Amino acid sequence: MWTVPPLLIVLVAAAYPLLRVCLESTKVGDTQRGWSTWSEVLASPMFRDALWRTVSIAVTSTAGCLVLGMFLAIVLAFVPFPGSRVVGRLIDTVLALPSFLITLAFTFLYGSAGAVNAAISSLTGATSSALNFLYTPVGVIAAEITFFTPFVVRPLLASFAVLPRPQLDVAASLGASPLRVLRSIVMPEAWPALMAGGSLVLLLTLNEFGIVLFTGAKGVITLPVLIYTRGIVTFDLPGAAVIATVQIALSLMLYGLYRMVFARLMSGRGRGDADVVVEPAK
């Protein structure tokens, strides 16, 4: 009986609105229903371009977050330096900020009238902006990597915190190089956290709207931006609902794929879990 109230809350707060969106996508006119809106939207070159742009930006940003996040987490966890705790707190602070603030900061730094371009102009005497990447897909990807990397760093730091330090010390005392310790001991324990952070970043970048909108990047039309354009600007609610339904299906598919891969990874770890043996250096 205690499971009924939470289930009802989920159905009312999440499932019902999503169902209404899916039903709205089948509306034709005021009273009829059909699939003509689907055919029109899916055949549109703008939709196909937006779908490709959304997936490519999300995958590229996720890859960048994984590489940068792994590097930062390893440095913060295993390479002590003055101010490391402050850096960790700053990374946590980014998690509490809205995404458009990062874009605003990028505008002040790398925009056509930003601090970096002003400094370059003062040094070189150039009259045009030296950096123009902010208003391109590269600028969107850079802003997303900056904003979403902490979502990878935090799970990795939590995973590294529970690593048995004596095991690392023994491996080092036996002559294992830092790279071998990282590959043989650290990385196997970090895979679940890396997958969790990476899958979260992929879903977030796939549905990111604020960064793309605030950069004002020309030609960067993603699915969320296209939903906004058709639903709010042109007030084409059925067309926006079709794109939103595709977005929902894509997100659920990626989440299901993540759960399947994660379950197989954990079951494989359970079957083959054994102490790591590091041979002494010869």
Residue ranges and their predicted role:
Residues 262-282:
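Short cytosolic juxtamembrane segments of multi-pass membrane proteins
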Residues 27-31, 209-235:
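Glycine-rich helix-loop "coupling/hinge" segments at transmembrane-helix boundaries
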Residues 1-29, 45-161, 189, 193-209, ...:
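Membrane-water interface segments at the C-terminal ends of transmembrane alpha-helices
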Residues 33-43:
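A short amphipathic helical element positioned immediately N-terminal to and/or at the very start
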Residues 171:
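The alpha-helix within a helix-turn-helix
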Residues 174-176, 188:
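Glycine/proline-centered hinge or cleavage motifs at structural transition points of membrane proteins
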